[in-house]
Amino acid sequence: MTDADQAREQIREYAVEAALDKLDLDTKARLLSGQDMWSLPAIPEIGLKSLVMSDGPIGVRGVRWTADDPSIALPSPTGLAAAWDPELARRAGRLLAQEARRKGVHVLLAPTVNLHRSPLGGRHFECYSEDPYLTGAVGSGYVNGVQDGGVGTTVKHFVGNDAETERFTVDSVIAPRPLREVYLAPFEAIVANAHPWGIMTAYNRVNGTTMTEHQYLVNEVLRAEWGFDGYNVSDWMAARSTTGDILGGLDVAMPGPQTVYGPALAEAVRAGEVPESAVDTAVRNVLRLAARVGALEGAPAVVEEAPAPIDGQALARELAARGFVLVRNEAVADGSAALPLDAAAGGTVALLGAAARDARVLGGGSAVVFPERIVSPLDGLTSALRDRSGASLTYTIGADPSEELTPADKGFELRAVCRDASGAVVGEGTLPSGQVQWIGDDLPAGASYETMASIEVTGTFLPRENGEHAFGTRGLGAFTLAVGGETVWEGVQEMGNEADPFEAFFGAPSERARVTLTEGEPVEVSLTFQVPDVTALPLKAIMFSLLHLGPQREADELIAEAVEAARAADTAIVVVATTERVESEGFDRKDLALPGRQDDLVRAVAAVNPHTVVVVNAGSPVELPWRDEVAAVLLTWFPGQEGGAALADVLLGDTEPGGRLPTTWPARFADAPVTEVVPTEGRLEYGEGLFIGYRAYEARSIRPAFPFGHGLGYTDWAYESLEATAETVRVRLTNTGARPGREVVQVYLAPVDDGVERPASWLAAFAGVEAGPGESVETEIALPARAFEIWDEEARGWQRIGGTYEVRASHSHGDTRLTATLDLA
């Protein structure tokens, strides 16, 4: 920090203290409670603007859960981490800061830095990695980037929120060493290296104490030990105890206006249950945030002028390609690798799979944003091959992974019409799909919870196929469904036994009717929902969906058509995918199988075309039982809005696939280190201790399908020399291929007979290098002191473990290229 920066920081602190001195108890308590779903109250008398928050982490949705104000949609966080490039993450963060400033958002509710403890985790796609060091490095880059743009970040979910099942109440039981060395480590690294302006405490308990009330982890570890000076906000509806939360270090209870703070907090102070100094501490943290983002009069913002504009579409395309991981690339008939395709030589490409046409570009839940455009694989390849002489593209659906109803989307033009009890329209707006998700004040203009008696999702549907179309609903309450002007179902959906209040919405859809329709002939559709009285609820919300599923042709017939298309083509590209019923916030996965008959499709196509390339459009690992039967496998994660364009760039060789696996890819579900995420009597034991991810595979001598850190490019690298000290590792390598490329040099430490219980090896550091054909490059990589330390619970501190270490310069955890011996005193 420069002298000028320090001076500005002092001015901000003076402004914070001056503002705090002017507030009475009731106003202070009100400031700590959300005024609505996404903001804190303004206090004009001290020059405080309303602080506005918004979900991330791959875009900035803003304060409305609608497509009215589109947002850029970047690749999923796992895809971003796959680039193994903190500086690239920083650039992504700067773009999101630009989006936030455009939308009037002060604080982004991201990044998510929980770990890939189990591939079953419903929000696996929203987290970076199974490795704490990689997570901390990428997360630090992201936080630095967002805050470079003058927008605050909220690192979440602190801590132990690594699965969705019973997430509101589960007790994550984690021993001291894994808690410190694994699960807290990314948060600690980000606090140290990026100085985040906010953190979000999770719903769950850790070792018996609710995280929003966890005095030890928040007050003692996060603040006193690590030096965190930002604001601490609850996950939405996680704050449940006025005294417990304020004494546990929770600054802000969200969402409002009905929270455990506000009047309840002021009363607790007056009753002597809470010292006013605890309230002052929380208010000080909120005012400091306001000062940093420019929302407090008299305090200079950290960033006063908006940075230079960034081309969002171009960066989204670059990010996608940099995160694509080529895990297999075998030689085909002419002896060359399957990828990149030789489009200049012409030939026919058969593109197969439902996800090639209707791409899944992001995961479900609070990470959802509404991009202005989406480039599917079909769009991207069609555009890229249009000007390539002799090249042609065919498309066949092959097999559809969506065997369940989903929110009405393709072919639907819908709007929501809100009416009062007399039937008069009080508000209306367009819908991007059949999903209505209005939370807090996120309502169409003119509508209110007090006046709305019904909401009608209405519009037209232009079928893309002949046959029997299924329609359904999701949500709780009374519905009337009409198709073609006729009521086809009317009834009430009651609440089940779901512990998670969002689970009914995110849970299983209900089919209500089947209607035979004709391709290309529009039909009117309508779903009317009777609005219940929600005015007394702590969180006012309306959530329901009009669902649709197109005609389901026999899978064997679809696969047969795909086989014929593949047989006639020079190259077959099969896009396989998960669905929103497989990967989303609100629930965990049951297994790692691809939905539907997609495995059968791949095998059938590979049997007739030896040049079969499989593109895996999934946010987290899936089983690939056919992986040795195809020429190439490319993992694209949830690639964001420009995914199809980036895919064409990579397949045709215009761009090298830059990704390396941020998580181990199991050969089968049974091999995963953690295969159970359902709590027992409310407790989820982290019995694996330190051994998650690649650490567990190595400890159990299990070979995964693809190891942590694995990824192929379009060139080759020779590792030539390695020098290691306790502070740095120096590696020299040469690009021995015929084209420029990027390599990620991964440094692992392996202790030699030290007698300490810990993994056999772990990632200590990494660096990316670039070189042209025949060019050599040398990189010096700093080794963090923490790489040699373990947590000593008795001493309540970190202990440096001396002895002999093998230092490994590796292409992946399973591919060590050079080793050196290091004796550590």
Give the label of every model feature segment:
Residues M1-E793, G797-H813, T821-L824:
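Glycoside hydrolase catalytic-domain context in secreted enzymes
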